[in-house]
A protein has these predicted regions:
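Beta-strand signatures of extracellular beta-sandwich domains
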Residues: 35-37, 117-121, 160, 216-220
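An aromatic-rich alpha-helical recognition segment common to small helix-rich domains
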Residues: 93, 109, 120, 146, ...
Length: 282
């Protein structure tokens, strides 16, 4: 019945939609009398009138949701056709936060009361290519963990609110025009030294905890606690201990360890550990 091929209109709340025209295959001179019906007056208001014998109508959208408009032949409900008006949420989330670990960004955002859920997009900083990475169903579901991010790469995340609907048998999402945004760079965890012990003559043994994703560790040493910045070893074999030799007995040595991984041929560093000290045996 409805002449328009695309029977979905996606709009923002407050917009007015003009209903499409219609036609019938009839053998007589007169077309049957028809009427427009709406399924939910709380999200949209329907007004109709006749112009040159044709029924026309407008729909004033009020709130987020999917309004189903039915054009049917009066007294013959089987002769009908539907037109769908998808109304986006009024507002996007107002804020978004991000926590990072190795190859992971954990997002959180403020709730949007009239949303069916949220669309998450991501792009590399400096790029114009925005990629949809998730649709999160549920008004109250306000977090998402991106485990496909890469350590050392800066990303821009956008969070949209959406109205969910079915379009020709396929699930689709009507996103808000605005969004909450946050920048995040996944990074290695902080190193943690566990001990510096004198186990041999003029030497100290350093131990630390394994950092997830680290491919190596830089060991720093100094005799000045306020300036532990001299690199003495680059551990590349995944070891989490190191024996520092040829030290002077009786002196106090200060150490810290910094993890790193290699991304696109470059070292990306995590935070260095706290400082521990030790004295070699005489």
């Amino acid at each position: 019945i409805i002449s328009k091929k695309d029977k979905y209109a996606v709009v923002s709340a407050g917009e007015t939609v003009t209903l499409p025209g219609y036609s019938f295959e009839t053998t007589g001179d007169d077309e049957p009398e028809v009427e427009w019906l709406i399924d939910d007056n709380s999200i949209a208001a329907l007004t109709t009138s006749k112009v040159d014998g044709k029924l026309t109508g407008e729909v004033k959208t009020l709130a987020a949701g999917v309004a189903v408009l039915t054009l049917q032949v009066k007294d013959t409900p089987a002769d009908k056709d539907n037109y769908y008006i998808v109304i986006k949420p009024k507002n996007a989330p107002s804020s978004c936060t991000a926590d990072t670990t190795y190859n992971t960004v954990s997002l959180g955002w403020s709730k949007t009361a009239d949303a069916d859920g949220y669309t998450i997009t991501r792009k590399v900083e400096g790029s114009d290519t925005e990629q949809t990475i998730a649709h999160v169903d549920g008004t109250d579901t306000v977090s998402y963990k991106d485990t496909a991010a890469q350590t050392g790469i800066s990303y821009i995340y956008h969070v949209y609110a959406y109205t969910k609907y079915t379009n020709n048998g396929q699930t689709d999402y009507a996103n808000t025009d605005t969004y909450a945004s946050v920048k995040a760079t996944p990074q290695l965890g902080k190193a943690a030294m566990t001990s510096v012990t004198a186990e041999g003559y003029s030497s100290l043994t350093l131990k630390w905890e394994k950092v997830d994703g680290a491919t190596g560790y830089i060991v720093y040493r100094s005799t000045d606690k306020s300036k532990v910045d001299t690199q003495i070893m680059d551990i590349t074999n995944g070891a989490v201990s190191y024996v520092d030799t040829a030290l002077t007995a009786g002196n106090t040595y200060y150490y810290k360890v910094q993890p790193y991984c290699v991304v696109n041929g470059k070292k990306v560093y995590g935070d260095a550990s706290g400082i521990l000290s030790g004295k070699p045996l005489p």
